[in-house]
Amino acid sequence: MNKTATCELLLFVSGEAGLTLTELSSLTEMSKQACQQQIDYLKEKYHSDRESALTIIETAGKYRMATKEDFSEILKNYAKTPLNQSLSKSALEVLSIIAYKQPLTRIEIDQLRGVNSSGVLSTLRAFDLVEKVGQVEAPGRPSLYATTEFFLDYIGINNLEELPEIDESRYVAEQQTLFNESEENENQ
């Protein structure tokens, strides 16, 4: 199998998280030096290819694929166009959680929802409704997410205080009812 293509594939599928040289080396069973050579080759290849919108960047010791800065406006315009369509229920749920409880980590969102929210968060970030606003000083340094100025414009409010109040006790009661019904169905 082609070493360059293997590194390129792994950088692509790692997405926003990226990979360290150690991780890439472990996944490819190549030395760190060999992985670095492949990354350097890919960086140069993308840099010199004026027909490609891709590049490889290094941030905090992790390598990831990204779009070249020249294409940022096109990407922003693309990301915003699907807003003419409706957001999925999952996206609306995550957006609501973030709007009312921000800032919070993906893990906190996952715990509130009971399912993984990575994909939905990526979608909301691509739509510029949610952004990373910092990191928690804890192992792994998880990112904190909050809504954007565009979110306020999109829903037509000036600040978060204008969000309608929610009755959390009603929400908790509804969740408990659903849980009890689910348990009853499993016991039958």
Curated annotation (Swiss-Prot):
Matching SUPFAM superfamilies: Winged helix' DNA-binding domain
GO cellular component: cytoplasm
Any Pfam family the entry gives: SMC_ScpB
One example of a Gene Ontology biological process annotation: DNA replication
Signal peptide: none
Alphabetized InterPro entries for the sequence: ScpB_csome_segregation, WH-like_DNA-bd_sf, WH_DNA-bd_sf
Disulfide cysteine pairs (residue numbers): none
Keyword annotations of the record: Cell cycle, Cell division, Chromosome partition, Cytoplasm
Keyword Cell cycle: yes
Cell cycle found in the keyword field: yes
Main localization category: cytoplasm
Compartment(s): Cytoplasm
Protein family per UniProt: Belongs to the ScpB family.
PANTHER family referenced in this protein's UniProt entry, alphabetically: SEGREGATION AND CONDENSATION PROTEIN B
Xref: HAMAP family: ScpB (MF_01804)
Function: Participates in chromosomal partition during cell division. May act via the formation of a condensin-like complex containing Smc and ScpA that pull DNA away from mid-cell into both cell halves.
Known partners and oligomeric status: Homodimer. Homodimerization may be required to stabilize the binding of ScpA to the Smc head domains. Component of a cohesin-like complex composed of ScpA, ScpB and the Smc homodimer, in which ScpA and ScpB bind to the head domain of Smc. The presence of the three proteins is required for the association of the complex with DNA.
Name of this protein: Segregation and condensation protein B
Lineage: Bacteria, Bacillati, Bacillota, Bacilli, Lactobacillales
Gene (UniProt): scpB
